[in-house]
From Swiss-Prot:
Taxonomy of the source species: Archaea, Methanobacteriati, Methanobacteriota, Thermococci, Thermococcales
Gene assigned in the entry: gcvH
UniProt similarity note: Belongs to the GcvH family.
Keyword rRNA-binding: no
Protein name: Probable glycine cleavage system H protein
Known role: The glycine cleavage system catalyzes the degradation of glycine. The H protein shuttles the methylamine group of glycine from the P protein to the T protein.
Cofactor remark: Binds 1 lipoyl cofactor covalently.
Biological source species: Thermococcus kodakarensis (strain ATCC BAA-918 / JCM 12380 / KOD1)
């Protein structure tokens, strides 16, 4: 884990400038979540509108919305693909994203252009540097 001030950055993940992370699993699917920075900036989460299983998304498309006490924020797809699973525990317990944003993923995607799109994402070290610049 890399620490940048009060924020934690988990190594082995890919990150976007919008503070989503992507984890490539051994079977080639991708888990998507939000970073520690994102959950701290949002504050206490009240609701996660999960995407529909079967939804096709392109990199940068809105994957879902998260409501906090401060605002409603959009979560963008870090890679293109089909939503094949969602973390249903978040429907009843959105605060799981506050408690551990790296263990509590939002959706699992079957990617369609993974190799190319991973090149456009940041590794943990690059994301930590990005956070230092904010």
């Amino acid at each position: 884990m890399i620490e940048v001030g009060e924020y934690k950055v988990k190594e082995g993940l890919y990150y976007t400038k919008d503070h989503e992370w992507a984890q490539v699993l051994d079977d080639g699917t991708v888990l998507v979540g939000i970073s520690d920075y994102a959950q701290k900036e949002l504050g206490d989460l009240a609701y996660v509108e999960l995407p529909e299983v079967g939804k096709e998304v392109s990199k940068g498309d809105v994957l879902c919305e998260i409501e906090s006490v401060k605002a409603v924020s959009e979560v963008y797809a870090p890679v293109s693909g089909e939503v094949i699973e969602v973390n249903e525990a978040l429907e009843d317990s959105p605060e799981l994203l506050n408690e551990d944003p790296y263990e509590n993923w939002i959706a699992k995607l079957k990617p369609t252009n993974l190799e190319e799109e991973l090149k456009e994402l940041m590794d943990a070290q690059a994301y930590a540097e990005y956070l230092r610049s904010l």
